[in-house]
Regions:
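The feature captures the LRR N-terminal capping module
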Residues: 1-226, 230-246, 253, 257, ...
């Protein structure tokens, strides 16, 4: 249904047309002063409203939860854009023009049909947050390794089978979410992510952790649930900041003594492994107040 007169929430600098059931956008909605924020979340738009491109000062654009099959090649005209959310659409390609969005800090591409991301994405040197979950990525896009300011990367629910050796270049990364992919290993170079606080690789096929894993000394939350781990490296005892460790549904039958060195650990989940008896190393952890499930 086309709403000829949608219920607008407009100020001098912003336009909010969320949840109006719009299939098209009336030109009159975007006339007037240059807008800084436009939100068209949760409508039925099949085509990107090209009138948006006239708002050269636009800083925030939310066009998520529509039915867009493509993004405009001229998206680069919005050079002041700091946040772009085009998640939950039907697009299969990110236009090369995205390289012009040099002010972009937040980019949401989740739940589309992307099989890769363009090399031009690597020019977004201010990007701090990238979400490309629920797509069809079969490998880590090379452009991501150029995003030196990136602090949070969410790529879960894809088909990624490996991480490149260059992954360690993301020195600012604080959160990495890769659950529900096809990883069989983590590269040694992951130890170079010295700022990493959160690592979630649940539901992959990881058979072992690299010996360098203990260098992730700022890690506080580690989720390794539903993988194929048969043992843990001794270096795991170096993760002194760790507060939560989820090892459910692996193939562990023993634990390294170094685990007792995790004095900040508050929660340890070991259910659905292969322990014949309670590992002795758990006693000091329980004594210090760690909640252990086994």
């Amino acid at each position: 249904m086309l709403h000829q007169h949608p219920q607008q929430n407009r100020t001098a600098q912003s336009l909010d047309l969320d949840g109006q059931g719009l299939e098209n956008l009336d030109d009159a909605c975007l006339q007037g002063n240059s807008l800084l924020k436009i939100s068209l979340y949760d409508n039925r738009l099949r085509q990107f409203p090209r009138q948006i491109l006239q708002h050269a000062d636009l800083q925030v654009l939310n066009i998520s939860c529509n039915q867009l099959s493509e993004l405009p090649t001229e998206i680069g005209l919005l050079k002041q854009l700091a946040m772009l959310d085009c998640g939950h659409n039907q697009a299969n390609q990110v236009p090369a023009g995205i390289r012009e969005l040099r002010e972009l800090t937040y980019l949401y591409l989740s739940d589309n049909a992307f099989r890769d991301l363009p090399v031009e994405l690597g020019r977004l040197h201010k990007l701090r947050y990238l979400n490309a979950t629920d797509n069809q990525l079969s490998e880590m896009p090379a452009a991501i390794m150029q995003l030196g300011a990136l602090q949070e990367l969410r790529l879960y629910n894809n088909q990624i089978a490996s991480l490149p050796e260059t992954f360690g270049q993301l020195s600012a990364l604080r959160e990495l979410h890769l659950m529900n992919n096809r990883l069989v290993a983590l590269p040694e170079q992951i130890a170079q992510l010295s700022a990493l606080r959160v690592l979630d690789v649940e539901n992959n096929a990881i058979g072992q952790l690299p010996t360098t894993f203990g260098r992730l000394v700022n890690l506080t939350h580690l989720n390794l649930r539903t993988n194929r781990l048969q043992q843990l490296p001794t270096s795991i005892g170096q993760l002194k900041a760790l507060t939560t460790l989820d090892l459910r549904a692996n193939q562990l039958s023993a634990l390294p003594d170094s685990l007792a060195e995790l004095t900040q650990l508050q929660r340890l989940d070991l259910r659905w492994n292969n322990f014949a008896e309670m590992p002795a190393v758990l006693a000091p952890l329980i004594a210090q107040g760690c909640l252990v499930h086994i």
